[in-house]
């Protein structure tokens, strides 16, 4: 990656999605993790629910209800599916380029916003909050997950739910488990695309046990709705009343 131009962490992904929208052709985003793992993401994954997580995506859409917030919406693949199913959906992403792509694809309500800092008076309340394509990873750490779940409570109507998918890294001794205290923490991730390298950011790979521990401590009820053979899972968090 030597010689690449440094940009905001989300800029390479946003640029790749915008290029895909303009050309109709998939673009490749290079990903490097701090544990040494590197791989490529194809922009096509952000444009269609068909693919590796199709079963979880379709289940999440079926389980959605009422007014929906699509957090970390990317190119809007879930928002568009929800719109087609006649849901009222608000899509947010921290990347202005991603929001531009969503608007270009026909997402009716897409905003540049940070899910950690949403104003209930501005955005209103929701019956369902989605974190799909493992976007719950933006929490960055278990501490960040606690902070996120606390910040989301005022945004949920009574009886509301959070639907999220995630997956653990391989095994209990994966690099994101601190050997000193057992706390699951984030992996630093860097995106690169066509000569630009984003700033590194922390991403949380969240196993079911860690999610259950944090959710239970904060008074959320956890239900795992579905799993894939590869270990990804779809879960529902329900807000405890009283």
Task: Name every feature range the model reports, one short phrase each.
Residues 7, 11, 15-21, 31, ...:
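SAM-dependent methyltransferase
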Residues 43, 47-67:
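Conserved alpha-helix/loop element of class I SAM-dependent methyltransferases that forms part
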Residues 72-76:
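Class I SAM-dependent methyltransferase "Motif I" SAM/SAH-binding loop
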Residues 95-96:
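Conserved SAM/SAH-binding beta-strand->alpha-helix loop
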Residues 106-117:
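Conserved SAM-binding strand-loop segment of SAM-dependent methyltransferases
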Residues 126-146:
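A short SAM/SAH-binding and catalytic strip from SAM-dependent methyltransferases
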Residues 144-158:
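A short glycine-rich, Lys/Arg-flanked "PGG" loop and its adjoining helix->strand segment in the class I
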Residues 220-242:
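Core SAM-dependent methyltransferase catalytic element
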